[in-house]
């Protein structure tokens, strides 16, 4: 059985940067906290916890120590609270997310009503929204955009892991809602390239394996776009979840991984597939 790994599977620039900053912070003396999971990989979060990094939902009673800001960013209020408490802040926010936050703030200050295209429940979006100083709403789809009221000036940004097609459809609806529209395409290039690679690979294989946390938006989207072309698509977090029955009648299997998936997890999955293949042929 041939195993084909997508070229850009695994850590993107922002995640690689964030994990490196987190592990460096964990090695220093003193209390270290992560304001939310550093990335959407339970396995990486567990390794940091073993090094003493405690994941927090909020700053609460924390009065000292180092706070690591996750790659998805946090709200402006949380960041201000950390500064007010004079905590040491290691800001591991992805630069692409940071740019979206800045765009929202600038649009808002310029008098635009802001539309954020994305998942309202995602921490990245909640952080981006917090930088608006005026009216702001989150739109997840073309249908939701159609329900927006008329507005004079609309400013649009996107969650970095959104698909370009969804952004395009929302923008087209917004054109019907306002006379003046300003758009910032804040979708990360790595997200678009990964999706293009994954769909190209899904067309040529008999089975697709997508590796990544079940709480990872970009991994979920990878699995969705692959499943549209290859029904035998399976999302997993670890090699232990692989079912040998998935590979019955399979000559070629494609493997890709979300932006928060470490290389060692990808290697374990590929090794497990090889073991299953060897057992079939022995």
From Swiss-Prot:
Q: Where does [4Fe-4S] cluster bind?
A: 12, 94, 188
Its recorded reaction(s) are: isopentenyl diphosphate + 2 oxidized [2Fe-2S]-[ferredoxin] + H2O = (2E)-4-hydroxy-3-methylbut-2-enyl diphosphate + 2 reduced [2Fe-2S]-[ferredoxin] + 2 H(+); dimethylallyl diphosphate + 2 oxidized [2Fe-2S]-[ferredoxin] + H2O = (2E)-4-hydroxy-3-methylbut-2-enyl diphosphate + 2 reduced [2Fe-2S]-[ferredoxin] + 2 H(+)
Q: Cite the Gene3D superfamilies for this sequence.
A: 3.40.50.11270, 4-hydroxy-3-methylbut-2-enyl diphosphate reductase, catalytic domain
Cofactor or coenzyme needed: [4Fe-4S] cluster
Pfam families reported in the protein's UniProt record: LYTB
Pathways involved: Isoprenoid biosynthesis; dimethylallyl diphosphate biosynthesis; dimethylallyl diphosphate from (2E)-4-hydroxy-3-methylbutenyl diphosphate: step 1/1; Isoprenoid biosynthesis; isopentenyl diphosphate biosynthesis via DXP pathway; isopentenyl diphosphate from 1-deoxy-D-xylulose 5-phosphate: step 6/6
Give the residues annotated as active site: 124
Domain of life of the source: Bacteria
- Which residues participate in isopentenyl diphosphate binding? 40, 72, 122, 216, 218, 260
Q: Which residues form a coiled coil?
A: none
Residues annotated to bind (2E)-4-hydroxy-3-methylbut-2-enyl diphosphate: 40, 72, 122, 160, 216, 218, 260
Q: What class of enzyme is it?
A: oxidoreductase
The record describes how the cofactor is bound as: Binds 1 [4Fe-4S] cluster per subunit.
> Its Enzyme Commission number?
1.17.7.4
Q: Which UniProt keywords apply?
A: 4Fe-4S, Iron, Iron-sulfur, Isoprene biosynthesis, Metal-binding, Oxidoreductase
What's one GO BP annotation on this UniProt entry?
A: isopentenyl diphosphate biosynthetic process, methylerythritol 4-phosphate pathway
Q: Which InterPro entries match?
A: LytB/IspH (IPR003451)
What's an example of a GO molecular-function annotation for this chain?
A: metal ion binding
Q: Which family does it belong to?
A: Belongs to the IspH family.
The record's NCBIfam families line, in alphabetical order, gives: ispH_lytB, PRK01045.1-1
Sum up the protein's function in the record's words.
Catalyzes the conversion of 1-hydroxy-2-methyl-2-(E)-butenyl 4-diphosphate (HMBPP) into a mixture of isopentenyl diphosphate (IPP) and dimethylallyl diphosphate (DMAPP). Acts in the terminal step of the DOXP/MEP pathway for isoprenoid precursor biosynthesis.
Q: What PANTHER family is this protein classified in?
A: 4-HYDROXY-3-METHYLBUT-2-ENYL DIPHOSPHATE REDUCTASE
Name-wise, this protein is 4-hydroxy-3-methylbut-2-enyl diphosphate reductase
Record the organism.
Geobacter metallireducens (strain ATCC 53774 / DSM 7210 / GS-15)
């Amino acid at each position: 059985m041939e195993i084909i790994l997508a070229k850009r599977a695994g850590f993107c620039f922002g995640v690689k940067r964030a994990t490196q900053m987190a592990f460096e912070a964990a090695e220093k003396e003193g209390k270290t906290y992560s304001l939310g999971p550093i990335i959407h990989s339970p396995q990486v979060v567990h390794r940091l916890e073993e090094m003493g990094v405690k994941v927090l939902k909020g700053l609460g009673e924390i009065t000292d120590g180092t706070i690591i800001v996750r790659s998805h960013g946090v709200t402006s209020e949380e960041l201000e609270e950390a500064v007010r408490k004079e905590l040491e802040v290691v800001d591991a926010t992805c630069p692409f997310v940071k740019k979206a936050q800045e765009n929202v703030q600038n649009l808002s200050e310029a008098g635009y009503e802001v539309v954020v295209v994305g998942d309202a429940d995602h921490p990245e979006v909640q952080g981006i929204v917090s930088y608006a100083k005026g009216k702001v709403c989150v739109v997840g789809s073309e249908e939701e955009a159609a329900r927006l009221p008329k507005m004079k000036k609309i400013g649009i940004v996107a969650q970095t892991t959104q698909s370009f097609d969804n952004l395009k459809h929302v923008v087209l609806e917004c054109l019907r809602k306002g006379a003046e529209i300003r758009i910032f395409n804040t979708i990360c290039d790595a997200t678009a390239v990964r999706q293009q690679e994954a769909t190209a690979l899904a067309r040529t294989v008999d089975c697709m394996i997508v590796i990544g946390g079940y709480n990872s938006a970009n991994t979920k989207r990878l699995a969705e776009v692959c499943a549209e072309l290859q029904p035998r698509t399976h999302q997993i977090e670890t090699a232990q979840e692989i079912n040998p029955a998935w590979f019955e009648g399979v000559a070629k299997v494609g493997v890709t991984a979300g932006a928060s998936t470490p290389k060692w997890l990808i290697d374990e999955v590929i090794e497990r597939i090889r073991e299953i293949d060897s057992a079939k042929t022995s």
